[in-house]
């Protein structure tokens, strides 16, 4: 059949009509959201784009510092709670406030497994992972040289530009994979690529699908490239896990071999199922592995990226961190020697990492929950939030509090080390992994991130390795890279660079 060519004027008219129709559809969606939020009898703030969200939240907090307000952002609507409500929400069970429902909705649980985790997964993460931090740390230190030398190939005797956001997902995948599934699987190129892509595709798919109503997502999602590759990566990882389990069964029949660090997480997952009289299937363990992978790679690689920016911007602090490594590990001893006794003594390093997180958290708000109590969520302010609504606690007023942190806008590398020197409860209160009303960047309460000890240990091993082996600096004439925003999420600039030079 001959092709039909429309005149330019006709094509333009069609394009304009489509654009007008699309704008009207978006307008109708925003209008529907506003009506829904107005039904709450709360003040409503509307952010029309990702880049004005910070300003909108600051405006809301300035006007309503001690009471909730409703917020509409691109693709999302929620109730923003004041800091005073942290104690209200921190300990409520799933049948009153659900973090799982939030994760399922936010991270496309029907495609990603998010929000579908089993009790056995929670037990393994909450108890076995925390209890066995020394074993996890041993896997990191055993793998750090391989991970960094594989991913970060910098020629000697010269400054080389690198993009931390490009390299850190692979570093996090290799290190976490050593702890999760062990060698040799954790080093297989297709395993690394699939885990990195899975994590990135979850967030990319959400960035697109958030603009569609929930009822239409099942119609749109199968046609998205991100969802297609998400399914492909899930399938490959599932096949790898099934083979790993088969190999483990076969090894039981072989003579015992000396245990090398790594591969503990899969065993911990299996043990929690066995404790309940169950045998974990390959599909269940694949789901558990992917859930752990997303948490470790996405948040961890972002945190490592921010830390790299902060190291490059603060050379004097880097010198002090190296001195601390000398004092704790010994002169010129590398990150490979960090163990369970050395890690808690790296107080300045802990402070540096927490300060980086304070100024570059994962989200502008935290402690996300969907109200599931049929009677709603009753706040201290007297407001009742009906079931089905998303609530979150504002985090920026804490992170930027001049009362808690003098000159809060300034990066002060050893701010928390000085606070810990005050002694008493301050020793624990100001650690990187501590949560409370003064730090909700890991959440708080019964659903505080159980992997924060895992993440903190991994970040410190990477930082120790980097500053032992490289000098860092910002590119001359360029400012400290600024974060990007997608909805309420904060993520580092993927195009931002720093310069590295191997140390002699």
From Swiss-Prot:
Cofactors required: heme
InterPro entries: Cyt_P450, Cyt_P450_E_grp-IV, Cyt_P450_sf
Membrane topology: Single-pass membrane protein
Domain of life: Eukaryota
Disulfide links within the chain: none
Glycosylation sites: 197, 299
Transmembrane portions of the chain: 13-31
Family: Belongs to the cytochrome P450 family.
Name of the protein in its database record: Cytochrome P450 monooxygenase gliF
Organism field: Aspergillus fumigatus (strain ATCC MYA-4609 / CBS 101355 / FGSC A1100 / Af293)
Lineage per the UniProt record: Eukaryota, Fungi, Dikarya, Ascomycota, Pezizomycotina
């Amino acid at each position: 059949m001959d092709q039909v060519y429309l005149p330019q004027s006709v094509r333009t008219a069609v394009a304009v009509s489509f654009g007008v129709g699309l704008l009207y559809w978006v307008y109708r969606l925003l209008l529907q959201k506003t009506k829904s939020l107005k039904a709450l009898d709360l003040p409503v703030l509307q952010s029309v784009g990702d880049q004005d969200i910070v300003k909108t939240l600051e405006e809301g907090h300035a006007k309503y510092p001690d009471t909730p307000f409703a917020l509409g952002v691109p693709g999302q609507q929620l109730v923003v709670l004041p800091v005073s409500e942290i104690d209200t929400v921190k300990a409520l069970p799933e049948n009153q406030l659900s973090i799982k429902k939030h994760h399922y909705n936010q991270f496309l649980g029907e495609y990603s497994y998010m929000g579908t985790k089993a009790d056995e997964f929670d037990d393994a993460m909450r108890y076995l992972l925390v209890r066995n931090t020394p074993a996890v740390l041993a896997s990191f230190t055993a793998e750090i040289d391989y991970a960094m030398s594989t991913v970060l190939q910098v020629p000697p005797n010269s400054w080389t530009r690198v993009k931390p956001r490009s390299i850190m997902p692979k570093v996090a995948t290799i290190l976490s994979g050593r702890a999760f599934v062990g060698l040799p699987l954790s080093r297989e190129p297709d395993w690394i690529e699939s885990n990195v892509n899975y994590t990135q595709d979850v967030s990319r798919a959400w960035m697109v699908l958030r603009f569609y109503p929930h009822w239409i997502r099942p119609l749109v999602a199968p046609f998205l490239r991100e969802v297609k590759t998400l399914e492909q990566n899930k399938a490959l990882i599932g096949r790898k896990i099934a083979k790993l389990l088969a190999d483990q069964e076969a090894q039981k029949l072989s003579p015992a071999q000396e245990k090398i660090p790594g591969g503990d997480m899969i065993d911990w997952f299996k043990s929690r199922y066995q404790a309940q009289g169950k045998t974990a299937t390959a599909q269940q363990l694949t789901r558990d592995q992917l859930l752990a992978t997303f948490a470790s790679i996405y948040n961890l690689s972002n945190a490592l990226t921010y830390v790299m920016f902060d190291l490059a911007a603060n050379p004097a602090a880097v010198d002090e961190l190296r001195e601390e490594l000398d004092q704790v590990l010994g002169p010129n001893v590398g990150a490979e020697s960090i163990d369970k006794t050395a890690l808690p003594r790296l107080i300045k390093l802990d402070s540096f990492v927490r300060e980086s997180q304070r100024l570059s958290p994962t989200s502008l708000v935290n402690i996300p929950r969907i109200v599931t109590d049929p009677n709603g969520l009753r706040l201290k302010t007297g407001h009742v939030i009906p079931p089905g609504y998303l609530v979150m606690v504002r985090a920026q007023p804490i992170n930027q509090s001049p009362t808690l942190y003098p000159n809060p806008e300034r990066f002060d590398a050893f701010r928390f080390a000085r606070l810990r020197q005050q002694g008493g409860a301050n020793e624990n209160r100001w650690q990187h992994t501590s949560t409370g009303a003064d730090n909700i960047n890991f959440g708080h309460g019964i659903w505080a991130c159980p992997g924060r000890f895992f993440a903190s240990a991994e970040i410190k091993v990477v930082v120790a390795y980097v500053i032992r082996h490289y000098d860092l600096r910002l590119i001359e004439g360029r400012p400290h890279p600024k974060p990007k925003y997608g909805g309420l999420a904060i993520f580092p600039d993927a195009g931002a660079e720093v310069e590295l030079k191997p140390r002699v």
